[in-house]
Structure formats: C-alpha cells, structure tokens
C-alpha cells in the first residue's frame, strides 16, 4: 500500500518586508528563502536562499513576481493511491492529473481553450524525494528537508518520468491564489484516502486566518482511465508507458527497458517471415467438440466461436510455409490469445501435418510455442496429440536428419512443454519467458510447498541447461538465418 501527497506552497508579496524580498514588475524577481525542518504543529521557517523567478514565456499576465512555486511529491506507505487532481492557471483554465499506481496508470486531461499559450518555465527536477520546478538556473534546489522515507521505487520513478516528460513540453503551473495576510502561505495537501465508491475533497488552508479555499481533488463520473487506456500499454518491468501505435513497429518491445510484451501469432509471422512469402496451411480446420463437453458457464462450441470472432483465427495455432531471409521454411506459431494457446485435437493435427509436409519437402522447421498446455475440454484426445506430434518429429529428426528449431515464448507450460516444445534440435527461449510443466499455483496447491520466485523463468532454466539460447526478439530472425546456413539451408537466390 502506498500514498502520494502533492504539496503546493506559495509565498506572497507581503513577505518582502520581513524577509527582504525585492520587488520587480514583469521581470526577474528574487525570493530569499530556505525551507527548514518543520513539524506538524508549526509552519516552515523562511530565510536564507535566493531564487530568481521569471515570467512564463515572456507574457505579462503569467508573471511570477515575488512568488516561488514548489511542487513536491512525498512518499508514504499507508494508503492506496488512486485519485485525480485539479490544477488551475491564473486565467481560470484547468487540467487534471490522474494517478493510479495500483493499476499502473498516469493520465493528464487538459481542458484549456488554447494550449499554445501554455509552456513550462524550466524543468521538473527530482531531489531527495522531492520534485521541484526551479525557475533559476536549471539546477535542483538543495532542500534540507531530506525525506529519509523516500525510496527509489518503480512507481515513484514512473510517476516522476511521466510528469517530467509531459509538463516540460505542455504545461505552466501558475496558481493565482495569494492571500492578503502578512505572513500567510497557501499549502495544498492532497491526501489519498478514497475508496472505489467515494470521491473526496481536499483543501488549501490559510493557516493565519484558518480559512479554507477548496480545490477539487476527485470527481464523480470522471473515468479518465478508460478514456485513454486504449492508447497506451504499460511495461510490467519498468512501468514505462508505450504508445500502442508505435509498439508494433518496435516488435512489441518496451522503449525504456526492452521488456518483451506478448505477441499474437500474426504479429510473430510478420516478424519472422519475409514479406509476401507467407502461405497458410489448413486454416479452415476447426474443432467439432468431439466429446460434447459442456460447462455451466458456456458450451464448448460457443466458446470456440467467441474466440474465433475475437481473434480472427480458427484455432490456437497458425501453420504454413514461407521464407526467412530467403530460406524456405515450414513454420507453426501458437497464439496464446486463443483459449490460452491450449492444444486440442485440431492444434495437434495441424502441427502434425506441418511436420509431415516439411519431412517430404526437406524443409527446416520452426515451431513457436505459447500455450497453457492440453485443452481440458477435449479430454484424452488432447493428450493424444502429444504422442502424435512427437512421433512425427521422430521421423523428421531421426530418419530424415532435418533441423527442427523450437522457440519458447511466455508462457509455455503443460503438455506443450512435455512434448514438442522440448524436442527441438535447437531450443531457443525469449528473455524473461515463463516456462514450466505445472504452474506455480498448481504446484503449491498440490505439494503445499512454496515455489521460489524466478525458478520457472527462462534465465534460471537456461543456467540449468534446459535451453541452447536465449535470444531477444529483435535479433531472432538474423540468428535463425545463420543457424539454417550452418545446417546447409541456403536462400533460393
């Protein structure tokens, strides 16, 4: 559980007499202050350090005369962060910043009438657990309020990077709320204590007059999460945001850390097979519910139809012929989006036919595995596919001495791991792939033992000798081409 608190401190013109602030109209202004240690019962002491404040974009109506703006992010570990904050400029225009760390979401919704008039004055900095706008010389403000409870967490890094990249190019935060009190300051504290069915408000308090000026924090019927979720994909590893339209061109790799997102079978075929060389096989073959399996939730035939409609596929594997860097190949690609890539009678039949065709035509064979195992809706018929495929591979490998490359992606489990997944002459795994026979939950519930974290990851299994290679997705095609040439398979031209 975590909580994020956002603080906005504004020191007004009345401080100039007490703290020697020099007044300057529509130009560079200076404020000499240093924020020292404070407790919950007293306000900050101000003295010391000079900060120059310049007008935003050279516009008079955005002047920062004698005001320093500190935008801080303070980390706490108590409550769930899930709120939306309203920021308003001195023209009354507003924008919202939404954070949902539990669901890995950061969003900004702008309601400005003219976005071009807004710009950031300097940069957004991160220093000792606090992030500041520094309008002086672009260096981080050294604040003696070092927060020893602030940690360099993925969630913190994610939010900091999101705010930094966006606000630097778009937004000028310019609150225009200044009290007339001689020694007052405005302190906005947005506490995150909202449940799923509640929306709460937080106030900006004038401590000298004990009056409250309310800023709306949470909004009823505000669902910005759903509004923009279709545009972005968040990395599970670094929490970075990836724009969906660019993700395909980057072969579903995270721009920040290179994490491998899941891919559909069609996307993998597009990556591995040369353009205009793909020729599908047995694409009209589909299951007929051989054991008439019916569940309380949904009949098997209806479930098959729903996945066919959703994915555009007839089954959980695509098989066919193509060329890889000009080398003719036979390739089968499983699709986890179709019933978890489960292996039923049709999947087994399509893969067996592909192997037999490659045997007759003396073609190298590639099978990309992504499966949860045998399909329970087809009972023992699905288990029979393990033996059928293994038998066809025996003839292909042992009798014809041809090359079979097995590529294991995340996840590869169950009957696929126990059969053709581990029978390759060369076994290649993608980085961070989840590969196992029985899943972690099944093992723990059956044996009542805790499965160590990472014990079913590709890197750990590689150290134990289960694979030959771990190849990143962007290098896979070139590596396969070199392997085929090494085994005397050459391009047609």
Curated annotation (Swiss-Prot):
Q: Which family does it belong to?
A: Belongs to the AccD/PCCB family.
| Major localization listed first in the record, in broad terms | plastid
Q: Which cofactor does it need?
A: Zn(2+)
> Its GO CC terms?
acetyl-CoA carboxylase complex; plastid stroma
Q: Which pathway does the database say it acts in? A: Lipid metabolism; malonyl-CoA biosynthesis; malonyl-CoA from acetyl-CoA: step 1/1
Keyword Transferase tagged: yes
Give the Enzyme Commission number: 2.1.3.15
Q: Which gene encodes it?
A: accD
Subunit text: Acetyl-CoA carboxylase is a heterohexamer composed of biotin carboxyl carrier protein, biotin carboxylase and 2 subunits each of ACCase subunit alpha and ACCase plastid-coded subunit beta (accD).
Q: What is this protein called?
A: Acetyl-coenzyme A carboxylase carboxyl transferase subunit beta
Q: Which NCBIfam families match?
A: accD
